Amino acid sequence: MTGLFPDNPEAPIDLLALEGQALRRGYFRIAGIDEAGRGPLAGPVVAAAVMLPAGLLLPGVNDSKQLTEEKREELFDVIHREALAVGVGIGDHALVDSINILQATLSAMRDAVRALSITPGFLLIDGISNIPMNIPQRTVKKGDSLSLSIAAASIIAKVTRDRMMVEYDAQYPGYGFASHKGYGAASHLAAIAELGPCPIHRKTFSGVKEHLPSQPDSDTAGPSTGLFSF
């Protein structure tokens, strides 16, 4: 076995290996960070930070994308019950359009860390981008399948965002947010083409911006004819 990646692809990966490395380097209060919602055409990007007791095992916790919705909901409660601290940060659609999705994601991650009731001593972050915070940290590609703390954060972020999109489905019917959660499903693209974008759509994203109402000259502007005015 070499590092975290076993020579036998069927061998299980030690989801506590990264946490163990940080502990051996003298870091304590380790928090895993992940996000949900970078790719959708609508809604927020949600980040979560989870700090687990050292050595805690959480059977079933893995990359949230590999779990069923029912399993994620079940583990969401388990993580909240077993974790030392859980924090959530949200970058709404307006922030995404204002500063771009990467910067909105990092902002949400920073807010999630700040929301922790215990100040972390080390951050394990899914992805390749550091969070602009004065806390020792390590980025991990595919971290939600390599670190238990990051995997737990991915579940918290995913369930939190999914619940928000179900609420938005009731607020903006016709788009199917409860089913596709704002991602670019064929039914979602068809709804945008038919109804036009709604207020929570990301207006800088392809698939949405093409359907924004044109901005007429102020001298010739008449009443808005779209379903939603911006």
Swiss-Prot record:
Any one of the GO BP annotations: mismatch repair
Compositionally biased tracts (Polar residues): 215-230
GO cellular component, one term: cytoplasm
Cofactor(s) annotated in UniProt: Mn(2+); Mg(2+)
SUPFAM superfamilies noted in UniProt: Ribonuclease H-like (SSF53098)
Residue ranges of every copy of the RNase H type-2 domain listed in the record: 28-217
One function term, GO molecular function aspect: manganese ion binding
Cofactor note (record): Manganese or magnesium. Binds 1 divalent metal ion per monomer in the absence of substrate. May bind a second metal ion after substrate binding.
Localisation: Cytoplasm
Binding locations of a divalent metal cation: 34-35, 126
Residue segments, region Disordered: 209-230
Keyword entries, A-Z: Cytoplasm, Endonuclease, Hydrolase, Manganese, Metal-binding, Nuclease
Reactions listed under catalytic activity: Endonucleolytic cleavage to 5'-phosphomonoester
E.C. number: 3.1.26.4
Protein family according to the UniProt entry: Belongs to the RNase HII family.
Function: Endonuclease that specifically degrades the RNA of RNA-DNA hybrids.
HAMAP family (alphabetical): RNase_HII_B
Protein name per UniProt: Ribonuclease HII
Protein source organism: Citrifermentans bemidjiense (strain ATCC BAA-1014 / DSM 16622 / JCM 12645 / Bem)
